[in-house]
Regions:
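PLP-dependent amino-acid enzyme catalytic core
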Residues: 1-121
Length: 121
């Protein structure tokens, strides 16, 4: 598993401390086809129901994401992110967030015993 630059295709080890390529391109994660994602870090269930409502004769389906553990749909991304970095052995992360992403990531990081610093703009 390694990161590669979308722009110049340069490869970086998964343990790289860079947040982007030297050329300015963004990283993508390359995983072996047979490598499974391990999801063992959780702080609660990830199932939310669909509610059906009709407005002016049109049926709408509403997803009750507010029932996720931190009350935000951002739990889905944080769950995936933290499980992946926990799986590869990353022990410390930092992010910037004005709210839900920071709270969700910090909650899942705490469950995985990963040191998490959230910078609030």
């Amino acid at each position: 598993m390694y990161f590669y630059c979308e722009k110049c295709k340069k490869k970086y080890p998964i343990s790289s401390m860079n947040y982007r390529c030297e050329c300015g391109g963004m990283f993508h994660l390359n995983k072996a086809a047979n490598e499974e994602t391990v999801h063992d870090v959780t702080i609660g269930h990830m199932h939310t129901d669909l509610l059906s409502i009709k407005i002016d004769g049109i049926e709408y389906l509403l997803k009750t994401e507010n029932l996720l553990p931190t009350g935000s749909f951002k739990d889905r991304g944080a769950y995936t992110l933290i499980n992946e970095i926990h799986h590869v052995g990353i022990e410390k992360i930092a992010l910037d967030s004005a709210g839900n992403a920071g709270a969700s990531t910090a909650a899942y990081a705490a469950a995985a015993d990963i040191d998490c610093t959230v910078y609030v703009p």
